[in-house]
């Protein structure tokens, strides 16, 4: 990224690039006449107490495709309001794990990212595979986890559903769903401006404008821009890394000609230009017979290693990613005779990713390596919901999802490549290798779920889904370019790592059933108990990188179907005169043919594989309480024992694979699954003073703890993520001005400057690289709603 693009946020050049929404919000307005005539009430944020109230508000969700209280839904779920996200300054999907239990986000950058729930679904960089956790925004399924890696702006509500899903809506998943709902256009004028400034060059500005265009049509426009200098120092040239810029907008129209029909159109665009995903050296791996392979090869190549825990790297090439993504959707809802509701959701999205990656050294072992991706997806959903209040109510629907993805794998080796890779002299030095992959997916499904209200207190729910998917793919690699003419061992090594390859046509056809049985009983008016059995399946996929396929055969590129069986037992309660909400559940899940990532040490590529069977079992709880007027506390946590029941042909950790007489594979049965902390605990709270002069001072605090976790799939002693806890504080003041409300807050993220790692990565030669969490950051935010 050029220095020009990282200019100070207070320069005239930077001010010219403020989002259009801020300009609109400052200059445009809807007449107060519309506001006076509107019958749309001002919304109360979900899960927050109303002004001057000591009782919790009802949180409304549409999890079962009809509006109802979250406490009436007999399934484990977490609901976070948009206001809570703003108060806790959680504006990226990778920070969500600091708010809710059983969620882990493995994030490096937009491509190398994945979301897991209860330890299931941690498979980043899966170009040829959908995730085990479904990500939705405004009821549209996102085929790539990276499609959710943008700033969460203008959010109404975020819901996390745990366990297999698919009998009610959208795409089938085996681990759960994260459903993000943005604020819809309003027939009451709304405008907001927000700007934040913090350490390390952090600057974020957001704006929203909403209101009526006429009696039947309302519009909404939101935009943001975020930038930072970065928090990792490159010793090679003195530059700051792990920063950059992100910006985007969302435009909406809501057409509501009468009470029986509404249509909502959404269009959005986001882009990123950053050095996100800068990995630091975490561990150089094992020393065997007095030799540390990582250090010895680095020394032989002339590289100087630096301590990553000091937030330093030593890179002689760029670390850079660009992302362009966007899409459009149309949702229409009709109220039919007899109060049936018909819903149609149509969408199109695109996602383009281009990286530039260094090899982690300050010598030219590699000039650039990575995978660029271009993805387009289409979806159509139809749902019919029966009227509420009958003995039997139900939802039936049909769903189509299509995806067309191309990727390009590239490696530009430098003169020190053979020393660093341990290949014969001349094999890789100055060689260029380029490969291409393509996969087309067509998924068709029918689903239905119904509830029998057997008595006033007892309900029985059953759901079923049938999914049929076709995937066609191919993978190629061009003949290597450059390098010296070689023979013997060097030629063999070059053919293995960079030789020409063509997989031919690869095809997969799968039929995946899903099912749900649920019994719920209203123990008292304020306590609901439930038990659930569910089954979910997710079709297989294709490795879109050559890897070992020239030796193992093209069939080795195919990944089998993942199947999950799940059981839940839990309760939901609202107690203490609606001042305490307490929910808890136990769960047991077994996944067969679990899809995960592994590392091919010989070819130095990540690849997808089926890792035998996995069992996840544990307990989760969530509570919200108002112990006294003005104070709201949220406490949640989980214990999750997730391990491989069977994983016999797993990759070996370097302390085994580098030892003399090492086996070709290892048995990891009984080992903990990668990325899954056994213990997770989160607590946050806000205290507000309602003063007679109209001012509202407040303070907030949050605490997030995660126990240690396995860093990479081979479960090396040198690749473990230590436990950590992060503490955040903020204080602010709200007040009224000119029929609007202003707010100023001072915030401190990672208050005790804890050095912690969120994700680990296999670095080659037995070493490991890590992604550091955000250091202590002090900032200030100003906001005006009017």
Where does each model-flagged region fall?
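Structural signature of Gram-negative outer-membrane beta-barrels, strongest in the C-terminal barrel
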Residues: 254-258, 384-385, 399-401, 437-589
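Outer-membrane beta-barrel translocator/receptor signature
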Residues: 130-132, 144, 153-162, 167-249, ...
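Acidic, small-polar-rich N-terminal luminal/periplasmic segments of exported/outer-membrane proteins
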Residues: 47-48, 52-188, 569
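Membrane-embedded beta-barrel scaffold of Gram-negative outer-membrane proteins
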Residues: 329-335, 339-357, 522-538, 558-619, ...
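N-terminal Sec signal peptide and the immediately downstream disordered periplasmic leader
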Residues: 1-88, 94-100, 259, 328, ...
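Conserved C-terminal beta-signal and adjacent last beta-strands/turns
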Residues: 7, 17-23, 59, 210, ...
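Gram-negative outer-membrane beta-barrel transporters
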Residues: 37, 460, 583, 588-590, ...
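Periplasmic-side early beta-strands and strand-to-turn transitions of outer-membrane beta-barrels
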Residues: 179, 186-188, 196, 207-303, ...
């Amino acid at each position: 990224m050029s220095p020009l693009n990282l200019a100070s946020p207070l320069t005239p050049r930077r001010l010219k690039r403020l989002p259009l929404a801020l300009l609109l919000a400052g200059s445009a307005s809807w007449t107060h006449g519309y506001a006076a005539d509107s019958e749309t009430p001002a919304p109360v944020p979900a899960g927050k107490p109303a002004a001057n109230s000591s009782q919790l508000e009802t949180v409304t969700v549409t999890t079962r495709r009809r509006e109802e209280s979250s406490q009436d839904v007999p399934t484990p779920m977490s609901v976070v309001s948009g206001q809570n996200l703003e108060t806790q300054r959680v504006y990226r999907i990778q920070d969500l794990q600091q708010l809710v239990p059983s969620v882990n986000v493995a994030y490096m950058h937009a491509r190398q990212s994945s979301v897991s729930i209860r330890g299931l679904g941690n498979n980043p960089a899966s170009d040829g595979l959908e995730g085990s956790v479904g990500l939705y925004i405004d009821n549209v399924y996102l085929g790539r986890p990276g499609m959710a890696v943008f700033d969460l702006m203008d959010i109404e509500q975020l819901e996390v559903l745990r366990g297999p899903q698919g009998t009610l809506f959208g795409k089938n998943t085996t681990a759960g769903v994260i459903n993000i709902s943005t604020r819809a256009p309003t027939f009451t004028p709304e405008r907001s401006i927000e700007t934040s400034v913090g350490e390390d060059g952090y600057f974020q500005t957001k704006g929203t404008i909403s209101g009526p265009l006429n009696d039947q049509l309302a519009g909404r426009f939101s935009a943001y821009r975020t930038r930072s200098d970065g928090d990792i120092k490159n010793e090679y040239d003195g530059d700051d890394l792990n920063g950059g810029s992100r910006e985007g907008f969302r435009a909406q129209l809501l057409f509501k000609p009468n009470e029986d029909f509404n249509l909502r159109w959404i269009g959005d665009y986001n882009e990123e230009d950053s050095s996100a995903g800068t990995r630091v050296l975490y561990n150089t791996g094992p020393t065997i017979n007095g030799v540390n392979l990582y250090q010895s090869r680095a020394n032989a190549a002339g590289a100087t290693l630096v301590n990553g825990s000091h937030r330093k790297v030593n890179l002689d090439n760029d670390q850079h990613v660009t992302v362009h993504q966007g899409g459009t959707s149309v949702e229409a809802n009709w109220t039919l005779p007899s109060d049936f509701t018909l819903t149609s959701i149509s969408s199109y999205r695109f996602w383009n990713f281009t990286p530039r990656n260094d090899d982690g050294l300050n010598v030219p072992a590699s000039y650039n390596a990575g995978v660029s991706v271009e993805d387009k997806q289409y979806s159509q959903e139809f749902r019919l919901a029966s009227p509420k209040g009958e003995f039997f109510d139900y939802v039936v629907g049909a769903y189509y999802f299509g995806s067309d993805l191309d990727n390009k794998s590239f490696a530009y080796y430098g003169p020190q490549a053979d020393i660093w890779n341990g290949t014969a002299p001349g094999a890789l030095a100055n060689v260029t290798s380029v490969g291409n992959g393509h996969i087309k997916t067509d998924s068709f499904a029918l689903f239905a779920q119904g509830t029998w209200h057997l008595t006033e207190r007892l309900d029985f729910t059953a759901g079923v889904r049938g999914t049929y998917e076709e995937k066609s793919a191919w993978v190629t690699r061009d003949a290597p370019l450059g390098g010296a003419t070689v023979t013997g061992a060097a030629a063999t090594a070059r053919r293995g790592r960079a030789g020409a390859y063509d997989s031919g046509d690869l095809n997969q056809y799968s039929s995946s059933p899903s099912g749900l049985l649920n019994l719920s009983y209203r123990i008292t008016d304020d306590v609901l108990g439930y038990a659930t059995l569910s089954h979910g399946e997710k079709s297989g996929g294709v490795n879109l990188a050559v890897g070992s396929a020239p030796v193992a055969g093209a069939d080795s590129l195919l990944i089998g179907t993942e199947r999950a069986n799940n059981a839940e037992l839990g309760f939901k309660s609202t107690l203490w005169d609606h001042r305490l909400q307490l929910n808890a559940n136990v769960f047991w899940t077994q996944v067969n043919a679990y899809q995960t990532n592994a590392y091919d040490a010989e070819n130095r590529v990540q690849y997808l594989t089926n890792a035998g069977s996995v069992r996840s079992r544990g307990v989760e709880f969530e509570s919200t309480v108002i112990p006294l007027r003005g104070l709201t506390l949220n406490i949640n946590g989980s214990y999750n024992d997730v391990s491989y029941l069977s994983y016999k042909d797993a990759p070996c950790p370097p302390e085994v694979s580098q030892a003399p007489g090492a086996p070709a594979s290892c048995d990891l049965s009984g080992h903990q699954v990668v990325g899954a902390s056994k213990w997770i605990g989160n607590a946050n709270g806000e205290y507000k003073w309602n003063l007679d002069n109209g001012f509202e001072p407040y303070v907030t605090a949050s605490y997030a703890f995660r126990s240690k976790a396995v860093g990479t799939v081979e479960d090396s002693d040198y690749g473990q993520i230590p436990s950590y806890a992060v503490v955040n504080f903020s204080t602010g003041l709200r007040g009224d001005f000119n029929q609007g409300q202003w707010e100023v807050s001072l915030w401190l993220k990672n208050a005790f400057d804890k050095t912690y790692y969120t994700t680990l990565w296999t670095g080659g030669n037995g070493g490991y690289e890590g992604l550091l969490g955000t250091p202590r950051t002090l900032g200030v935010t100003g906001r005006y709603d009017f």
